[in-house]
Regions:
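Single conserved hydrophobic/aromatic residue that forms the stacking wall/gate
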Residues: 1-13
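EAL-family c-di-GMP phosphodiesterase catalytic domain
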Residues: 14-23, 35-141
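Conserved functional hotspot residues or short segments at active or partner-binding sites
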Residues: 28
Length: 141
């Protein structure tokens, strides 16, 4: 089926452990990149996400799981980890996105730690497309 890269592809990559042939999988991801798709690693920091992804998968975006953001203000180890990941991502040309931002304090800390982008309820709850367009795109019209 034809899918335009601008429309996204959803969750192509869920769990490295579910992939039987890593080489074939990596080649498939490279082919998607040739067609203009961006490859994202979602929920990094939980489940099967590991640092080995940086050496085995050529991806564009690393999305930090909200569990790392939730305790950011009180947890120095979480701040050190995110700051270190920001450096690694920057050096590798990977965009770092923090999920689950709910407070201005979290936002300020993530800016200081050099996180590229943030998302979360601080800005908006998930919206149906029509509601999003009505709320955010009217100013562009």
């Amino acid at each position: 089926r034809d899918v335009a890269p601008s429309r996204g592809l959803g969750d192509v990559y869920k769990r490295q452990a579910e992939v039987d042939n890593q080489l074939v999988f990596s080649q498939a991801l490279e082919k998607l990149k040739e067609y203009g798709f961006s490859i994202s690693i979602d929920d990094f920091g939980v489940r099967n996400a590991s640092l080995s992804l940086f050496t085995t998968i050529n991806f564009d975006i690393l999305k930090l799981d909200r569990s790392l953001v939730k305790t950011l203000a009180q947890n120095q180890k979480a701040r050190i980890l995110i700051r270190s990941l920001a450096v690694i991502c920057s050096d590798l040309g990977i965009k770092l996105i923090a999920e689950g931002v709910e407070t201005l304090e979290q936002l300020d800390i993530l800016k200081e730690l050099r996180c590229n982008e943030v998302q979360g309820y601080l800005f908006s709850k998930p919206l149906p497309l029509n509601d999003f367009e009505n709320k955010y795109l009217q100013i562009l019209r």
